[in-house]
Amino acid sequence: MKIIGLTGSIAMGKSTAADFFKQAGISVFSADETVHQLYKSKPILSLIEHTFPGVVENGKVNRLKLSKILINDSEKLQTLEEIIHPLVQEKEKEFIDTARQQGKKIVVLDIPLLFEKKGEKRVDSIIVVSAPLAIQKERTMTRPDMNEKKFSFINAKQMPDEKKRERADFIINTGKDLENTHQQVFSIIENLLKN
């Protein structure tokens, strides 16, 4: 079974590309979705509330409050990552084990910080989703609760797009229309199934 890492900086179109893989019948593990699921778990909620008092409201993590804390304190960001990342990797391993048992030929791991967290060692090939900076910024600024400071903070935590592209086995350029992105995904799937 081939394990493919799908990565890209914020607002590059990674989720759209992941959806196209799913539509083609490829199993996709989403690190972000897994984090959101973990945030609903009572033990994790308790741990987050204990570590970051006031960010859990009505049984949910207030992600806006949490992000405001993390933007201003890199040690707290590291603390959160130490809590969450091992649990995400555990879920990733379960996903891979299940896919192997099901006889899948290819699986995709959608991991935003694949390079930054040394995840490239866990995959056979890497796909980087990329778009021109102007498009990336335009997409980012349409997100709720996004501003220049938060955009700069997130970008600073991520490897520059050009470096990711240099390390990629495949690049999906999402700067054009959705049909173009879909065709690129389809071509990559064909290539992976042949080799």
Curated annotation (Swiss-Prot):
**GO biological processes:** coenzyme A biosynthetic process
* Location within or outside the cell: Cytoplasm
Q: Signal peptide position in this chain? A: none
* UniProt EC number: 2.7.1.24
Q: In which pathway does it act?
A: Cofactor biosynthesis; coenzyme A biosynthesis; CoA from (R)-pantothenate: step 5/5
So what does this thing catalyse?
A: 3'-dephospho-CoA + ATP = ADP + CoA + H(+)
- Give me the residues that bind ATP, please: A11, M12, G13, K14, S15, T16
Domain DPCK span(s) in chain numbering = 3-195
Mainly localized where?
cytoplasm
Q: What EC class does the entry list? A: transferase
| NCBIfam families listed in its UniProt record | dephospho-CoA kinase
Per its record, how is this protein called by name? Dephospho-CoA kinase
Please tell me the species this chain comes from: Bartonella quintana (strain Toulouse)
Q: State the gene name recorded for this protein.
A: coaE
